[in-house]
């Protein structure tokens, strides 16, 4: 009773301010009288103005009238222009601010105001409004004008007063709207028992300093999301889509508010540090600094770290575990044999897998066997330079020399063979081409057939000796570890491929085969200068045959031998000197040859 008397006295003192608010409400109704329901509210406003007794029941009717004006503006917002909506919101904020200033002068009146606003809001949300309109209504109900004195007047020491209290006011209003959205979500899913218990906790949250308000609201929100996650979809199937949208929106609101608080706290921390730096140093100040540091460290921890933050109605999809079927071999030193892999593992030191083959750089790369196991595929014939063990007993040097040596032609080994003439042929051994006889094709083919048989036989027998390469694994790794040796292999392979192409062209040309000859001792091709004496001999033998024919023609001719012998002597001189004195004499000799050829044919 005493509280009501104090409230009535305060309202009587604020009679002029209340009349000003009533005139503003009447003006709003007059400017928007085309909206349905505002005429009745305008009549109610005039009735309130005529009453001179400003009591608590009158004040509650007055707050209810203002709430009804907000409800009509939200419901009929589509009928208004953007300019009209902005003007109406501006007037409503001014009205709310004036009502709040009056209620601030009495604690009991402020409490009555908050209870009446909350009651009116619950009654209005039960009316025919869409979900978006309800959210908009909650924003309008808690959209008081910025009041820096609200938070700057807190009982704190001077350095701790908030300078930018307008930002805190905005976060305070945003938290009120978020709280109302949570209450709406709970009321829409009232069939869940757990949510009914949480609804009481939301209603009991005190609107204190914005940051503590946020902490309490966020903790309750995590419990609400846990209820949605733990309940089956059959219970929430009715409002699943709307619940998902609302949950996402509330999460976004709390996320923005959290980061805004962090920004404000960091700015305030800088201000406090600047003030502390100007004060004289003593023990009490050091304690304050340490307490501030500990408090800021605990405050900067992420608040929205609950495990259910990203879970609401998202089917709780967990990240899939790593698939075990990767093609990358395991790195332990003794890996199991992988016979199916023809591609080496990507790490720089590849493990010695018996099935891995090092491909050579040519476009159709013939694989180099990694552990003396020849590859079976027929299209690319393997480089069998060291796949077949040589007669000497020690095998380790063979396993360590799987990569061909830098010289262009490979070393002579009995396992090398000449393949059939596809475009990418393997290198040719030095013992496969016979010495200089002109028709070399028959011996080459015969020797190729002889050499191909032992290669096939060793290819069949080699898998029996498969465990042997494990002894030479370290030697093989030392040979293939360095990237420089791999580059040398590419260069030597290109050179060998070029010599192979030249040799094949010589084989196909037949008459050019005598230009490429190999020394049986060194295995290197013989230089072209070695065949020049043969060409000179051929030239001399051709001249001798011509002279012999000329002698036969002269002896068979019935003409005088003296003139002919003179000519022959001239030719002999010319043959020795290899030059003619005049052009006329050369033409004369050529004419004599052409005229005497038919007699030789006869």
UniProtKB/Swiss-Prot annotation:
Residues 537-570 are annotated as: Central and acidic domains. It is found in: Cell surface. The keyword Ribosomal protein does not apply. One of its GO terms (cellular component) is cell surface. The keyword Repeat applies. Disulfide bonds: none annotated. Residues 578-590 have a biased composition (Basic residues). One of its GO terms (molecular function) is actin binding. Gene3D superfamilies: 6.10.280.150. PROSITE patterns: WH2. Residues 472-489, 499-516 form the WH2 domain. Residues 555-566 have a biased composition (Low complexity). Its main location: other. Signal peptide: none annotated. Recruits and activates the Arp2/3 complex, which in turn leads to actin polymerization, promoting Rickettsia motility during infection. Homodimer. This is Arp2/3 complex-activating protein rickA. It comes from Rickettsia montanensis. The gene is rickA.
């Amino acid at each position: 009773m005493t509280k009501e008397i104090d409230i009535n006295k305060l309202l009587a003192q604020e009679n002029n301010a209340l009349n000003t608010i009533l005139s503003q409400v009447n003006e709003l109704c007059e400017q928007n009288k085309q909206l349905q329901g505002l005429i009745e509210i305008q009549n109610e406003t005039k009735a309130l103005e005529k009453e001179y007794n400003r009591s608590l029941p009158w004040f509650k009717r007055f707050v209810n009238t203002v709430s009804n004006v907000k409800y009509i503006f939200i419901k009929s917002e589509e009928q208004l222009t953007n300019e009209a909506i902005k003007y109406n919101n501006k007037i409503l904020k001014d009205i709310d601010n004036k009502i709040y200033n009056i209620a601030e002068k009495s604690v009991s009146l402020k409490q009555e105001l908050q209870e009446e606003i909350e009651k009116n809001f619950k009654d209005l949300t039960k009316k025919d409004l869409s979900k978006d309109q309800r959210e908009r209504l909650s924003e309008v109900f808690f959209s008081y004008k910025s009041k820096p004195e609200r938070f700057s007047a807190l009982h704190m020491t001077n350095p701790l007063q908030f300078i930018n209290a307008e930002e805190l006011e905005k976060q305070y209003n945003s938290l009120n709207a978020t709280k109302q959205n949570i209450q709406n979500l709970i009321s829409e899913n009232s069939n869940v028992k757990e949510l009914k218990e949480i609804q009481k906790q939301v209603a009991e949250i005190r609107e204190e300093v914005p940051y503590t308000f946020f902490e309490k609201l966020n903790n309750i929100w995590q419990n609400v999301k846990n209820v949605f996650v733990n309940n089956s979809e059959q219970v929430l199937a009715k409002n699943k889509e709307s619940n998902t949208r609302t949950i996402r929106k509330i999460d976004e609101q709390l996320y923005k508010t959290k980061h805004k608080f962090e920004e404000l706290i960091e700015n305030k921390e800088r201000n406090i540090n600047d003030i502390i730096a100007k004060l004289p140093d003593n023990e009490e100040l050091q304690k304050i600094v340490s307490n501030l540091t500990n408090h800021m460290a605990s405050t900067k921890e992420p608040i929205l770290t609950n495990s259910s933050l990203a879970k609401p109605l998202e089917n709780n999809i967990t990240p899939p575990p790593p698939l075990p079927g990767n093609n990358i071999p395991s790195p332990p030193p003794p890996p199991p044999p992988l016979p199916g892999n023809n591609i080496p593992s990507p790490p720089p030191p590849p493990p010695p897998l018996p099935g891995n083959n090092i491909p050579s750089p040519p476009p159709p790369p013939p694989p180099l066997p990694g552990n003396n196991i020849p590859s079976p595929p027929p299209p690319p014939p393997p480089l069998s330079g060291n796949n077949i063990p040589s007669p000497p007993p020690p095998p380790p040097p063979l396993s360590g020399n799987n990569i061909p040596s830098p010289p262009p032609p490979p070393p002579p080994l009995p396992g090398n063979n000449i393949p059939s003439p596809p475009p990418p042929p393997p290198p040719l051994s030095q013992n496969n081409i016979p010495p200089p006889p002109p028709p070399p094709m028959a011996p080459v083919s015969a020797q190729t057939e002889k050499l191909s048989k032992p290669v096939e036989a060793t290819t069949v027998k080699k898998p029996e000796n498969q465990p042997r390469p494990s002894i030479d694994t370290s030697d093989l790794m030392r040979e293939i570890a360095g990237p420089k040796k791999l580059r040398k292999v590419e260069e030597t392979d290109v050179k060998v491929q070029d010599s192979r192409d030249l040799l094949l062209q010589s084989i196909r040309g037949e008459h050019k085969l005598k230009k490429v000859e190999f020394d049986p001792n060194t295995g290197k091709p013989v230089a072209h200068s070695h065949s020049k004496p043969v060409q000179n001999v051929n030239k001399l033998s051709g001249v001798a045959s011509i002279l012999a024919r000329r002698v036969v023609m002269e002896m068979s001719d019935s003409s005088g031998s003296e003139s002919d012998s003179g000519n022959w002597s001239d030719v002999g001189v010319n043959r020795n000197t290899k030059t003619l004195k005049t052009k006329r004499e050369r033409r004369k000799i050529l004419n004599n040859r052409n005229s005497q050829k038919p007699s030789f044919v006869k």
